[in-house]
Amino acid sequence: MDNINKIPWQPGMTLENANGAVADTSLGYQYAIQTTTLIRAKVIEQKFYKIPFAEYIPVEVGTGAFLEEIKTNLTYDSAGSFESGIQGTSSGPTQVAQVTVGTSPKTAAIVTWAKGYQYNLVELKKALASNNWDVVSSKMKALKRNWDLGLQETSFLGLKSNSNVPGLLSNSEVTVDTTTITGYISALSYTDFATFVKNLMAAYFTNSNSTELPDTFAIPQIDYLGLEVPVSPQFPMVSMLDYLEKAFKRATQNPNFKIVGIAYCDQVNNAGYWAANGSNRYVLYRRDPETLKMDIPVDFILNPAATADNYNWNGVGLGQFSGTIIYRVPEVMYFNWAA
């Protein structure tokens, strides 16, 4: 295997921050020490990009365990105009206009996931000799972390291998606006910034058929970090972020409106999901389980390792999940630009 130091970072690679660039071939128990060497009791673990996705996407756990799909019926009225029900009082009986209703199912495909861990007697003895590392618990943690990070990424981006498992940012049914935002918001002049604020909510309200306003604006993390600059030289104490939050809270009449930075919205982190090179994607939406939801029919289960020969032990972690299904599509809107 080539040394990992020779592999440059590329768009679309897993979001992670390792303890430096470590080659798999360098991992092991043996390294040189001398009589004056101290091995610390505490180890430093690898870090990964983490975001509490359930705070941004409604999640339901436990529904549909060990099944293949969940269907949710969407109901519709077909009632015609209000005035079609007006009856004359000076003439004889007339036919009464009727209303009808209907349903249409929306399907959430359920994916079953399982991954194993293994260790043997010799590996245990070597780990014990290192004095400060529990190889078994480390493998269990790695398996659970793989599940957690996988759900996190899927909730926003979906699965590349299965179009029936979309993420919040990758639903093909959602309207994509490519004119309202054409660059980083944090780089706009005061005049262009004011125009953007004026146009954004209007575009969403039109897209929702004038029925709803959003409560969340998710933007690329890089842009979010740049919004702490002053909105203009005349107002140096007011940041662009403060101005936006105040304006959108007033426009939506919702004091809980949130602007959030999400790394998966950055073009470098979503390549291959909806475009080969990705794009900077902004999304206005409602954090409402009737608007969108991710199901986790079976949360992570870690089976204890078992052995058939008292030398090798094998264990399996498993779970089930769906993508982020958007039930009220007009209540979600994407705004794109690509570098």
Question: Where are these predicted regions, by residue range?
Answer:
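Hydrophobic side chains in beta-strands
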Residues: 113-119, 219, 317
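Hydrophobic, Leu/Ile/Phe/Ala-enriched alpha-helical segments that form helix-helix packing faces
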Residues: 147, 151-154, 197-208, 244-252
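Sequence/fold signature of self-assembling virion shell proteins
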Residues: 2-57, 228-339
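Alpha-helical scaffold segments that mediate packing/assembly in large oligomeric complexes
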Residues: 114-195
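Solvent-exposed, charged interface segments at domain starts and junctions
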Residues: 1-31, 76-95, 197-203
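Assembly/oligomerization interface modules of large self-assembling protein complexes
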Residues: 34-115
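Extended, solvent-exposed, turn-rich assembly/linker loops in the middle of proteins
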Residues: 169-240
